[in-house]
A protein has these predicted regions:
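N-terminal strand-loop-strand
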Residues: 1-40
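Residue-level marker of positions within ordered structural domains that often coincide
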Residues: 15, 102, 146
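A generic secondary-structure boundary signal that marks alpha-helix termini
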Residues: 19, 63-64, 150-153
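Functional cleft and adjacent loop/helix regions within the main domain
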Residues: 36, 40, 46, 84-86, ...
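Charged phosphate-binding loop/patch that engages nucleotide di/tri-phosphates or the phosphate backbone
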Residues: 132-166
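Unchanged
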Residues: 43-139
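A periodicity- and composition-biased signal for non-globular, repetitive helical segments
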Residues: 33-34, 47, 144, 148
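A short, polar/proline- and glycine-enriched secondary-structure boundary/capping micro-motif
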Residues: 34-38, 118-119, 142
Length: 166
């Protein structure tokens, strides 16, 4: 059995002017040769912790400075196991993080490395759900959307409460 690789993905969003989250996806060539959309991701290097891996990989793959991103929370983990010994497949434990980007999405750029060929900067929830091939990733996107919207509701409740006190 091959070693299990630890990796981290960043489900990255920024808030649009209409207060709806917009997601960042990367386009790449899949092993099948088709173009797929994925979240920025990568492997742990050295003694790096999983959150630092997520921030570093998103920064490396999109050009977003680490200081313009904030991990909101861990969304979940999956175990990917290669039971058929397919070429290019490896055993991985993947940790997913919801990350907020506070900068201008116009400045996000793709690095033409690791097979990446482009970027989608402003995907709505429905666009992401239509573009993402993998069901488990679509579920994480749905979960992230609920977390973001619940956070907005909580902020509105706090503002209303403070206004009533004043």
């Amino acid at each position: 059995m091959s070693p299990i690789i630890q990796s981290a993905w960043g489900i990255v969003y920024h808030m649009s002017s209409d207060w709806e989250p917009r997601y960042l996806l990367i386009k790449r060539h899949a092993l099948s040769g088709k173009i797929e959309r994925v979240a920025p991701k990568g492997k742990i290097q050295g003694n790096e912790d999983i959150q630092k891996t997520a921030l570093r990989e998103v920064s490396e793959e999109t050009g977003i400075p680490i200081n313009q991103m904030r991990i909101k929370q861990q969304l979940g983990t999956t175990q990917l196991r290669n039971t058929e010994n397919q070429k290019g497949q490896m055993d991985k434990d993947v940790t997913y993080f919801l990350m907020e980007y506070a900068g201008n999405p116009d400045f996000v750029k793709i690095e033409h490395a690791e097979g990446y060929i482009g970027i989608h900067k402003r995907c709505t929830l429905n666009e992401v759900l239509a573009l993402i091939y993998y069901q488990d990733i679509r579920e994480l996107i749905r979960k992230s959307y609920s977390i973001i919207k619940d956070g907005q509701k909580n902020m509105d409740i706090k503002k209303d409460f403070i206004n009533k006190l004043g």
